[in-house]
Structures are given as structure tokens and as C-alpha cells.
A protein has these predicted regions:
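ATP/Mg2+-dependent ligation/transfer catalytic cores
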Residues: 1-2
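Generic helix N-cap/helix-start motif at coil->alpha-helix transitions
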Residues: 247-252
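Extended, well-ordered protein cores
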Residues: 5-7, 11, 18, 25-246
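Contiguous, well-ordered alpha-helical segments that form the cores/surfaces of helical PPI scaffolds
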Residues: 253-259
Length: 259
């Protein structure tokens, strides 16, 4: 019988217990991964990245969870593959895909599990008597900057004793931002080109081919004539960046893609 903790680690392989499980049982160095015969995990890692590129979401099925070692191992391997590719767009899309998939899965968790995930991610929440979740103001501000709907602004929130009240869906959205940031930052860690095993290089090439096909299939547009041709949503992000305000990873990706 597989324990719930192990299944949870497979479902959310960015959690510390997933990293601890893998590090206890598998040599995570590139040399070690090559020797462990990690072909099934490598195949799943490629699938993770392709899910992100093609579906904009990394899906994890019940069968994936049962293959918990493969599932946990596929996450750091996917990070290595994306890092090796050194493509900023792929980095951001992969981070978004992992975080979006995690968000959808978190919506089906109990309050207890959701709060546990938040605590492990450094986004601690407290359940109040009305089943609302309370998040410290600095933590909330650090994550909610990614959202621009009026109801996310602090002035429109209920604040109690240094905590912002959020419902479980909003709490999961905050966790999604944290997962996105974590995954993106991990893909920035350099991988020595000479240390990458041959089978990993083939996997990177497979991902690169998918990306190149997506780029080739993009419709071509005539060059913009001026600011008057820019959609309002793009103009708002550009103006924010020109004013020195912090644009989210996703906003910068949108601007770069459009321009």
C-alpha cells in the first residue's frame, strides 16, 4: 500500500519531501542519473515539458502518481532539460505549465492538505472559524502583484491582525504564483554542457523540435505602426515597465511575444 505522503509528493514533486525522497534513493548528479537507467523518468520529463508547451498545463494522472519514483524523478530531469535548452520562452512556458497543473490539482485537495502545501512552499495560511484562509500581508503582497483584477488589491481585501483573508481558490492561486516562481528560478541554474548525457541531449533536441514547430506555425503579423496599434492590455504592461514597476514573468512573456 502506497502511503498518502508518497502520492502527494508524486502529485507535487516541487515539495521538499519529493526532493528528499529522491536524494535519499537516487544520485541526482548528471553522471548518477545516466547510470541509474532513468529512461522512463526521462521520457516522462519530456512529456512534462511537451504538456506545458502544447497544453499550457502539466497533467498528472492517478497512474502517474502510482509510478511515484518515476514521477518525482521526472520533475528535476525536466528542469535540467529546460535549463539545457537555454530558451527564455520555454523556461517561462514550462514554469507556467507546472504551476497551472498544480493549481488545478490543489483545488481538489482538502483544506488541511492545501495549507500543508502552502506551509512547505513558504506561503503559510491559517484557517479561521469561517473557513477562510489568512495569509500574512507581506506574503500576500509578494504574490498578489501578479494579479490585476480590482479584488486582488489590498485596499479591497479584509485585513485582520496583519493577515489578509482569502478563500481556498484564491489561496491556491497564490500558491500557483509561488510554484511558477520556484520552477522558473530552478531552470535558470546553469547545466555544464559537457556533463549532459547523450540521452538527455536527444531529449532536449526533441523538445526543441516541438518548440520550433510551434514557432513555425505562428501566424505572421505586419509590423506595428505605432502605439495606437497596440492592444490596451499590452500598452498597460509596457507603461508599467516604463514607470519602473515590476511586471510579472507572464506579463514580460506576453510583451516579448507580441513585440
Amino acid at each position: 500500500m502506497i502511503g498518502e505522503n508518497v502520492l502527494r509528493a508524486a502529485r507535487y514533486p516541487f515539495l521538499p519531501e519529493a526532493r528528499e525522497f529522491i536524494s535519499r534513493n537516487i544520485d541526482l548528479s548528471l553522471e548518477g542519473l545516466e547510470k541509474t537507467g532513468s529512461e522512463t523518468a526521462l521520457k516522462r520529463a519530456v512529456e512534462r515539458v511537451k504538456n506545458a508547451l502544447l497544453l499550457k498545463e502539466v497533467k498528472v494522472t492517478a497512474l502517474d502518481e502510482l509510478n511515484y519514483v518515476r514521477e518525482m524523478l521526472s520533475f528535476p530531469i525536466a528542469i535540467i532539460l529546460v535549463s539545457t535548452l537555454m530558451n527564455e520562452y520555454v523556461r517561462r512556458i514550462y514554469a507556467l505549465g507546472e504551476s497551472r497543473g498544480a493549481y488545478k490539482r490543489m483545488l481538489h485537495e482538502s483544506d488541511e492538505t492545501l495549507l500543508y502545501i502552502g506551509e512547505k512552499l513558504g506561503v503559510k495560511g491559517i484557517l479561521d472559524q469561517e473557513n477562510m484562509m489568512m495569509v500574512r500581508v507581506p506574503t500576500y503582497l509578494n504574490l498578489a502583484y501578479s494579479f490585476h483584477a480590482p479584488h486582488w488589491k489590498l485596499v479591497n481585501r479584509v485585513v485582520d491582525n496583519g493577515h489578509v483573508l482569502v478563500n481556498r481558490m484564491e489561496y491556491a492561486r497564490l500558491l500557483q504564483v509561488e510554484v511558477n516562481n520556484y520552477v522558473y528560478e530552478k531552470t535558470l541554474e546553469p547545466v555544464p554542457a559537457g556533463a549532459v548525457p547523450e540521452n538527455f541531449k536527444k531529449a532536449v533536441n526533441a523538445i526543441s523540435e516541438v518548440w520550433n514547430r510551434l514557432e513555425a506555425d505562428k501566424p505572421s503579423y505586419a509590423p506595428l505602426r505605432g502605439r495606437e496599434d497596440t492592444p490596451p492590455c499590452i500598452s498597460r504592461i509596457v507603461k508599467k515597465m516604463e514607470n519602473g514597476e515590476n511586471a510579472s514573468h507572464f506579463e514580460r512573456l506576453i510583451v516579448a511575444t507580441f513585440m
